[in-house]
Amino acid sequence: MFKAVVSDLDGTLLNAEHKVSEFTRETVELLLKKGIKFYIATGRNYLGAKEAMDELGVKVPLITSHGSVAFDENGNEIFSNNLKREYLDKVLDIDYKSFGKDIIITGYSGPNWFVTEDLREYFYNKKPDRTRYPKQITPEEFKKHNFTKIFFLGEDHDELLEL
């Protein structure tokens, strides 16, 4: 008998349309009724994971940002492993725009998702299923935060590889 089940989101709990199927919803409900603990683990940030949890119709603990942050079923942060400031500062000091004018930096800080440029058009065109978007802040504000995950986004794969 299983004591717990941990599931990823994309391609596991969520189908190709990034939705929870009725079968998945019923399966998770059955696990919980049997007393089996259920957890969601994902590379997404808290808000992205919570959106999927809400669609499932359950309240379960969330492990986010590739395991660097965990939240209880009520959304309280219970664990966080931020990037070390010395390494974070080195990455944030990179002149990433010199690798490609369309490259942007983005990061997860606690339950928040921050970017330094407006991405509404990107999400509207490329990820129309998303209902939650990152908060835009200035590069100066970005450098003041602690992050559990930072990453670069861009259209040109070769530019990102060079970076």
Regions found by a protein language model. Give the residues of each.
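Conserved residues at the C-terminal ends of beta-strands
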Residues: D8, S65, L153
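Conserved acidic, metal-coordinating active-site core of Asp-based
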Residues: K101-L163
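A short alpha-helix capping/helix-coil boundary motif
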Residues: V5-D8, V28-L30, A70-D72, E140-K143
